[in-house]
């Protein structure tokens, strides 16, 4: 007895050309599931040096990764080409000159602090009775900024004489000077009192987000 069975709403049969060996793994095939070969098994079967032949219409995983992940060496070269030399503090000098000399020894203290900002602070203390009571200086280098702030301050006593001296130097890149000097001359009763300070800068390479003056 021969007849024809017609079913409705039945999906089409799996195309063996597109699915490959996947048909053998289906429960309706009557065959046990075939183990999926590993990458090294395919490489050994082809006899290649760890490479497998690409399938038509697909992309190899290595090719996709290479197109997305940039080369670190190329990034460093590109950043080095963008960065320009930057002036950083090289040395800092300060001096106070008195004529006549003070009767006692003058104490001089200095300190350097490295933090999110760069500070160089020094202080001069002298015995009571002298005109200049204190002298302090500060050099501030702010990270990720194109200017340098330099401040010098001298205080005088008693109060009827000049009480304070303040100077600020802002260094712009378009004026590439390396040495800045500030001088204060003070004459009281024909006695010379002189205050000198200087800042010296050098050019160094700078990479935008890597810390400030970590390389300075």
UniProtKB/Swiss-Prot annotation:
- Any idea where this protein resides? Cytoplasm, Cytoskeleton
Q: What is its main location?
A: cytoplasm
What are its GO biological-process terms?
actin cytoskeleton organization; actin filament bundle organization; epithelial to mesenchymal transition; negative regulation of bone mineralization involved in bone maturation; negative regulation of chondrocyte development; skeletal system morphogenesis
Superkingdom field: Eukaryota
Cellular component GO terms, alphabetically? Answer: actin cytoskeleton; actin filament bundle; cytoplasm
Question: What keywords appear on the UniProt entry?
Answer: Cytoplasm, Cytoskeleton, Phosphoprotein
Pfam families associated with the record: FAM101 (PF15068)
Q: Which GO terms describe its molecular function?
A: filamin binding
Q: Does the keyword Transferase apply?
A: no
Q: Which residues carry this modification: Phosphoserine?
A: 6, 26
Where is region (Disordered) located? 1-52
Q: What does this protein do?
A: Involved in the regulation of the perinuclear actin network and nuclear shape through interaction with filamins. Plays an essential role in the formation of cartilaginous skeletal elements.
**Family, as annotated:** Belongs to the Refilin family.
Summarize the subunit comment: Interacts with FLNA and FLNB.
Q: What name does the UniProt record give this protein?
A: Refilin-B
Q: Name its species.
A: Rattus norvegicus (Rat)
From the broadest rank down, the organism's phylogenetic lineage runs:
Eukaryota, Metazoa, Chordata, Craniata, Vertebrata
């Amino acid at each position: 007895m021969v007849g024809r069975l017609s079913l409705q709403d039945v999906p089409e049969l799996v195309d063996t050309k597109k699915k490959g060996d996947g048909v053998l793994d289906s429960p309706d095939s009557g065959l046990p599931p075939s183990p999926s070969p590993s990458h090294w098994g395919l490489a050994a079967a082809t006899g290649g040096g760890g490479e497998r032949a690409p399938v038509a219409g697909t992309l190899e995983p290595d090719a996709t990764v290479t197109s997305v992940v940039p080369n670190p060496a190329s990034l460093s070269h590109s950043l080095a080409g963008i960065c320009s030399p930057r002036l950083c503090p090289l040395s800092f000098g300060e001096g106070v000159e008195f004529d006549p000399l003070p009767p006692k020894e003058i104490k001089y203290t200095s300190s350097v602090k490295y933090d999110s900002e760069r500070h160089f602070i020094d202080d001069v203390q002298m015995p009571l009775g002298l005109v200049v009571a204190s002298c302090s200086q500060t050099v501030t280098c702010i990270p990720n900024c194109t200017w340098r702030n330099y401040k010098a301050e001298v205080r005088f006593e008693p109060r009827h004489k000049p009480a304070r001296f303040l100077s600020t130097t802002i260094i712009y890149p378009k004026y590439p000077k390396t040495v800045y000097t500030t001088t204060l001359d003070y004459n009281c009763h024909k006695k010379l009192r002189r205050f000198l300070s200087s800042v010296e800068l050098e050019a160094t390479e700078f990479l935008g987000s890597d810390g400030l003056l970590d390389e300075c």
